[in-house]
């Protein structure tokens, strides 16, 4: 006689009927008699119909190097699921590439694409019932999109990231192309040199080999507990990644049989762990939009102030580009996420659950015993570097105040984001003259034609979520950071966002944005801008070049607001119309209703 268990002991939607614990897919199968013949029409065997059904969702497509190789990994995950007694079904939600969208209006689709991919995965998962899933992605919007979808559909889930591409000749990496483009525009390198750099910056598949948004979000996926330990940001060309994908398929079946949902793993403590790791790696500022958006799907409150609080006093350890010296493929060689966590484990919640069915603390102990670090060392030896050349020890950090700060003031009442670890020390406190522009194109032109001088604050507005979809200001930051005269003497302020490859004095996500009447819309030429990163201040302290009181600034702002024309979106149909009408503040995650 089978033993009946209480439904409350089954965290997944397991239906108890006639003494048998029935997976949801099997119950729905009885309600939809067409399901079996349709699956048999795809070549399924009769015994496959009764197995745990595993969604194998990837962003595979010939869209960019981060996704072009994911089909092989998805097939490995499906093979693993089959070997563990499940049946995988491959689904695809191809992503776009921010790099290919740069320099034209295509970049306006970047952030909206995150939400659209999450929607498509929700449709895939819920239109055909699955008992668990393996989710595969590599890059800026695809990783957070699938993590958002996991939170929304809340099934047993394992994440596999597509790893990182190799560096090119002389350790050339893609984020340097923006710098070389600006140098070419200024006549500092030849066309032949520029062409060589372009043709050799991406020698393999995988995410771009620097600590940009793609690499950061791969690390965040593991930090949340949804990946097998040590599998984030592996070299995309190594066999270890295929093995990890196969193992993920097996793990997804095990989680489905246990009924362990994603929400049983991802908690507020998980997000706090991810933020501490983010501080240690000096991760992309875009994480401040992606993690809150993911947390929203898990019904967990998370705001930008949590990042600011946790980054204060956090030790920054990672010597990887763009803030550091080495390409991102070396991160795995040095021990990857587990090595970072080992260094900061006194500041982590080690009792959080992970997809292994063990706690984070147990996983870290297992890795010390199973040869993981020794295997990483075999890769590292080929570089001639030591582990501490890549990941510093907690007692010998690169910095001791994290990487991110949230600034506030009469320009950004709801906040603005700066990666202070990438800002020259002389710009941590500055008084600058405002040079406002209503689009990025005009600002870039002014910089490249030497209209911007030391002591200026370049302000780019109407580029927030409600303005234009919140594109990246990558070329502007590269034009500034590659100019020796400007890189440590001016600042960029915007309600838009930055590429994870950006460096230099760049302050973004200014909220409220100009399109919603935020004070950034009221700034005029030669207003005086005060930046004080240690005190977390961003404000106008003078009008037309003359310092004045806060009350006088507010009086002038009130007068200017009366003359400010209402914002009119240029998008009248399609995705960008929907996004710019419904997107939330970047301080809340910039997600679309």
Roles of regions detected by a PLM:
Residues 125-146, 157-161:
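A short, small-residue-rich loop immediately preceding and capping a beta-strand
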Residues 2-4:
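Position-driven detector of the extreme protein N-terminus
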């Amino acid at each position: 006689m089978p033993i009946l268990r209480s439904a409350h002991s089954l965290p997944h939607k397991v239906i108890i009927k006639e003494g048998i614990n029935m997976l949801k897919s099997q119950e729905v199968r009885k309600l939809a008699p067409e399901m079996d013949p349709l699956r048999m029409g795809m070549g399924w065997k009769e015994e496959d119909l009764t197995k745990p059904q595993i969604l194998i969702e990837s962003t595979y497509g010939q869209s960019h190097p981060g996704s072009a190789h994911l089909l092989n990994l998805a097939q490995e995950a499906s093979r693993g699921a089959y070997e563990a007694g499940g049946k995988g079904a491959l689904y695809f939600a191809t992503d776009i590439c921010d790099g290919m969208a740069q320099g034209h209006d295509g970049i306006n689709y970047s952030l909206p694409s995150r939400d659209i991919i999450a929607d498509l995965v929700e449709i895939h998962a819920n239109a055909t019932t699955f008992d668990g899933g393996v989710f595969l992605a590599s890059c800026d919007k695809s990783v957070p999109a699938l993590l958002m979808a996991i939170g929304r559909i809340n099934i047993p889930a394992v994440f596999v990231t597509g790893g990182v591409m190799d560096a090119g000749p002389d350790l050339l990496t893609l984020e340097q192309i923006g710098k070389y483009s600006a140098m070419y525009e200024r006549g500092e390198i030849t066309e032949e040199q520029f062409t060589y750099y372009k043709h050799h910056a991406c020698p393999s598949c995988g995410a771009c080999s620097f600590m940009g948004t793609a690499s950061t979000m791969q690390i965040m996926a593991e930090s949340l507990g949804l990946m097998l330990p040590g599998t984030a940001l592996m070299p995309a060309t190594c066999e270890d990644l295929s093995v990890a994908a196969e193992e993920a398929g097996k793990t997804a079946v095990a989680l489905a049989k246990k009924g362990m949902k994603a929400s049983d793993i991802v908690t507020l403590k998980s997000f706090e762990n991810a933020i501490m790791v983010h501080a240690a790696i000096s991760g992309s500022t875009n994480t401040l939009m992606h993690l809150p958006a993911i947390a929203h799907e898990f019904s967990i409150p998370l705001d930008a102030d949590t990042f600011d609080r946790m980054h204060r006093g956090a030790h920054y350890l990672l010597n990887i580009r763009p803030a550091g010296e080495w390409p991102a493929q070396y991160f795995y060689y040095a021990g990857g996420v587990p090595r970072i966590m080992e260094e900061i484990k006194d500041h982590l919640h080690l009792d959080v659950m992970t997809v292994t069915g063990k706690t984070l603390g147990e996983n870290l102990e297992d890795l010390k015993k199973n040869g993981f670090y020794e295997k990483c060392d075999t890769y590292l030896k080929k570089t001639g570097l030591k582990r501490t050349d890549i990941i510093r020890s907690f007692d010998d950090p690169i910095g001791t105040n994290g990487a991110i700060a949230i600034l506030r003031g009469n320009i950004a009442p709801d906040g603005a984001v700066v990666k202070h670890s990438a800002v020259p020390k002389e710009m941590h406190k500055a008084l600058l003259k405002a040079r406002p522009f209503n689009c990025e194109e005009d600002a870039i032109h002014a910089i490249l034609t030497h209209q911007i001088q030391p002591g200026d604050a370049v302000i780019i507005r109407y580029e927030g979520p409600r303005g234009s979809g919140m594109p990246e200001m990558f070329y502007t930051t590269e034009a500034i950071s590659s100019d020796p005269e400007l890189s440590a003497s001016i600042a960029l302020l915007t309600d838009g966002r930055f590429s994870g490859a950006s460096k230099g004095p760049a302050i973004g996500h200014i909220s409220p944005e100009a399109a919603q009447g935020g004070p950034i819309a009221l700034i005029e030429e030669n207003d005086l801008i005060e930046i004080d990163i240690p005190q977390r201040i961003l404000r106008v302290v003078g009008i037309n070049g003359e310092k004045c009181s806060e009350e006088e600034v507010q009086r002038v702002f009130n007068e200017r607001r009366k003359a400010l024309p209402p914002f009119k979106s240029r998008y009248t149909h399609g995705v960008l119309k929907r996004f710019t009408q419904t997107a939330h503040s970047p301080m809340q995650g910039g997600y679309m209703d």
